[in-house]
Every structure is written in C-alpha cells, then in structure tokens.
Design a protein with these regions (language model features):
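Phosphate-ester processing/binding pockets and catalytic centers
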Residues: 2-81, 86-350
C-alpha cells in the first residue's frame, strides 16, 4: 500500500526556449518524491531532567535512554495529537497499563476517509462507537477488525506507546505510598489544582508525566498538541477536582520536560457524538487491553480467554509497521524490593 502522505517536488527543471521567442518556452521536469521523515533512531534523552526531579522523571529518563530504539519523526508536521486509554482497574489485573497513541494529526485525512468507507461496508456508520478490546467477540466489528488493524498500520504516522506498571508498585513518586501521595495531594491543593485523593493524584501524575516526557521527544517548536482521552477518573468533573484541573496539571508538567514552545495545547475527552477521533482512540484501548492480557499470561502461564479477535490483536501489536512504531515498556517490582524496567519484545509465532 502506498504511503498516505506522499508528496512530490520538481527535482530538476531544464528550460528549452526557442531562440528569441519568449512566449514559446518549454520545460522538461523530473519529478522526484520527497524523502519522507517517518522515523528517527536513538539514543534519546530527557534533557531537562535533573537530580531535583521526582523519582518517576528519573525512571522515565532511564527508560528512554536504555529501552527506546526508535520514535516517529514529526519534524515536518504542524499538529500532534495524543490519544490515551488506561487499563488494569479490575482486581485480577497484575499491571496498570497506560497506553498512548501519538499521531501526526495533520495527516489523518486518508485514515479518516478509509475508515468511513470501511464502516459503511460493514454497517457501522449509523451506530458509531469505538473498537473496544472488551467488546469484539461477535458482530460487524469482529468482521471489520482485520481491515481496521490494517488501516491503522498503513495510514497512521505515529507511535503506540504502552507503559505497564506492576500493581505491587504502589507509588512511583517516592519510597512509600503514604508519604509520597500525601505530599502530592498537598501540593496539588496548594497550587489550586484540585483536591485529589491519594490514588487519583498518583494516577493523574503518572499519566501527565508520561505524556510530557514523550511530548518532549516528539514535538517541535510552535507545533500544536491535542490530548484526547477516554472518560476516566482523571477527567471527570467532580466536586473537588475536574477536567480543567487535569489540563492545568499537564500544562505545568509539560514545562518540566519541554525545552521548546508549543503554539497551542488543546484538550478533549471522548464526545457523546462519536467520530474519527474515537477510531484513533480505539488504538490505545486495544493496546492497553492486549498488553494487560499478555503480561497476565506471562505471569500466570494461563491461556488468555477469547476468540480469534484477541489473537488477531496480539498478532497486530507484535508485528512492526512502516509508519506506526509500537513500544511496550514494563516496570516491575524486583525480588530485592527495587524497581526494574525493560522493553517488552514480542514476536509472532509462524
């Protein structure tokens, strides 16, 4: 399949005028494709992180330096979007999964067009909803899933990044949960960023630190950044904190990591009226779900329940794509009580 954003320029032009006749000028041009900036290779580093930063910032910096080999190159783009979804809330889960799709949003037109054509063929336009990992067992979405995954790999320029954190790690911001979360709750309240409880503060700060860390590596001067999230604890409008507080927290944390200026930072959460944004949001939903299942299988040795649809998503997450980088990082509690991390390398069995 041809790349969805192919461009051409005149590589060479030779003027062939007839002598003394300027209205009869002819041109011969060789048209050559632009060399597309698709991916960039490491090493990478969070250049603003110092010893004064929280432990999680240092951990992310070590992950970036040691475990990230490649990232998408967005240097020619104007709008970057990050779609997020999270898993692991159920009691049987061994990990909290935080999944993010960073995408060159100014290039999503072909993806949107192809998805609409696909949905029309499968009767999925009228009742528009996400491709959710928990709800793919039958029906039109199950039949459309192979084509959907192919369109994701072929028409999205970006990266799907999943960070899985061992549930035995109760906080990534200090040595002890009670002390670390107490400090976070107090600081957020004093800064006018909402009155959070401990688990809520832990979750929102994990998420915005991950977004900001990778935004520092992926965005460039004067680009626009949009964060579009599924509805979740961190963006609900409650009595003591609300989505505006979450937005303000991200803006503060972006300043901790970015050395360049963004033109605009925008925010949205999943709308009642569904559309192509939710087709993008489905990507981290599928990634968070399948990584959760794969890590659980690795921990317990038990087979993952589900049919061909889940097997298909496992094959998708493990298969490299030309335009879409797929990165999964595991953060675990070590036998000695310390914290370890590593890239989760997956392979498809033939």
């Amino acid at each position: 399949m041809k790349p969805p954003f192919k461009k051409t320029v005149i590589g060479e032009a030779t003027e062939l005028p007839e002598t003394g006749v300027f209205d009869s000028v002819k041109f011969s041009a060789i048209v050559a494709p632009v060399e597309q900036k698709v991916k960039k290779v490491g090493p990478f580093k969070l250049s603003k992180v110092t010893d004064e930063y929280p432990y999680f910032s240092d951990l992310l910096n070590r992950i970036v330096q040691q475990s990230i080999r490649e990232l998408p190159d967005f240097s020619d783009d104007s709008k970057i979007a990050v779609m997020s979804d999270f898993g692991g809330e159920h009691s049987s889960a061994k990990f909290h999964t935080y999944s993010f799709l960073f995408v060159a949003y100014n290039k999503v037109g072909p993806f949107e067009e192809k998805i609409r054509e696909m949905r029309k063929r499968y009767g999925l336009l009228e009742h528009y909803s996400e491709f959710a990992y928990k709800n793919l067992s039958s029906g039109a979405k199950a039949r459309a899933l192979p084509e959907y995954l192919q369109l994701v790999d072929s028409f999205i320029h970006g990266a799907i990044i999943t960070i899985a954190i061992d549930k035995r790690i109760e906080t990534v911001f200090g040595a002890q949960k009670k002390q670390a979360q107490s400090v976070m709750v107090t600081q957020l309240k004093e800064e006018g960023l909402g009155e959070w409880h401990g688990p809520g503060a832990e979750k929102v700060l994990r998420i915005v630190n991950i977004i900001a860390a990778f935004a520092s590596l992926l965005t460039h001067e004067n680009q626009r950044l949009l964060w579009y999230s599924d509805r979740d604890l961190i963006n609900e409008d409650g009595k003591k904190w609300n989505f505006t507080h979450t937005q303000q927290i991200l803006v503060r944390v972006l300043g901790m990591y970015l050395s360049h200026r963004l033109d605009v930072v925008g925010f949205a959460k999943s709308f009642k009226e569904k559309g192509h944004l939710d087709d993008l949001l489905s990507v981290p939903d599928l990634a968070a779900g399948v990584v959760q299942d794969l890590l659980l299988q690795n921990e317990t040795g038990e087979d993952i329940p589900g049919g061909d649809e889940k097997a298909m998503i496992m094959q998708w997450i493990a298969t490299p794509a030309r335009y879409l980088s797929k990165l999964t990082i595991q953060i675990v509690r070590m036998a000695d009580g310390g914290i370890g991390f590593g890239r989760v390398d997956m392979a498809v069995k033939r």
